[in-house]
Every structure is written in C-alpha cells, then in structure tokens.
Design a protein with these regions (language model features):
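Conserved kinase catalytic-core helix
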Residues: 1-9, 24
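ATP-dependent kinase catalytic cores of phosphoinositide-metabolizing enzymes
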Residues: 13-14, 18-134
Length: 134
C-alpha cells in the first residue's frame, strides 16, 4: 500500500526482494510520486498497483486464483487497514514531503509534485476499488 500511496513505479520482481524470514522489501526508488516510466511514449505502469500470479500463489499457499482463500481475504483486509493507517497520517506525510522539495530530488522539485500524494490519500473507496480490481 505504501508503494501505491507514494506512487513508486518500476515495481517488478527484480525490485522486490524477500528476506530469509519471508519479509518483503523494495529496492530502486528512482520513480516516485506518479512519475511513471515510459517507453516510446507508452506508460509502462497501467494500473495503480500489481499483484502478480506468483504473489497470489504464495499468499494462497499454492492456489493461483485471487479471492479463493481465507489467506487472500486476510491479505486484502490487511492492505485496506494499512491504507487507512497511511491515510490517517496523510497530512504529516504531505508536510514531510513538502519539506523535501528543496533537496534536489528530480521527482520532488515543486508543490505540483505533491499532487499525486494528495490524490492517493483522498478516498479510501477509490483506493479499495483499484485494489479489488487488480
């Protein structure tokens, strides 16, 4: 959910690592706040977030169909809860990102760059719709 809210792009299996404990962690944060990669004028990320069949397989303990298991329902509920927590602290996140505008990050150089963050934090209904659709 954090990658969705922060608009972190270029998410693929080479940028998501797994620790021996089973915890996931992300690397390569070169594209944030909705500055998605394009190739030949085509936006590479076409949906707000992606849950691959491999991830569904792991979540469902071997099943590949989304929504077919209690594990997937628990995962979905956990994502919704995580979003609500992020949303609760949305003003703080916006303030912290606003303070970073002068740091020289190429994708955070003006107040306009904060609009993606504002938009993702606006509506839980819209976010839950995207999540359930994926």
């Amino acid at each position: 959910m954090a990658t969705y809210v922060l608009g972190i792009a270029d998410r693929h299996s080479d940028n998501i690592m797994v620790k021996k404990t089973g915890q996931l962690f992300h690397v390569d944060f070169g594209h944030i706040l909705g500055h998605f990669k394009e190739k030949f004028g085509i936006r590479r990320e076409r949906v707000p977030f992606v849950i691959t069949n491999d991830f569904v397989h792991v979540i469902n303990r071997g099943q590949t169909k989304k929504g077919q298991s209690k594990e997937f329902e628990k995962f979905q509920k956990s994502c919704e809860t995580a979003f609500l927590v992020l949303r609760k602290y949305g003003n703080l996140m916006l303030s912290l990102f606003a303070m970073m505008i002068s740091t020289g990050l190429p994708e955070l150089s003006s107040e306009k760059d904060l609009s993606y963050l504002r938009d993702t934090l606006v509506s839980p209904t819209k976010s839950f719709y995207y999540f359930k659709k994926c």
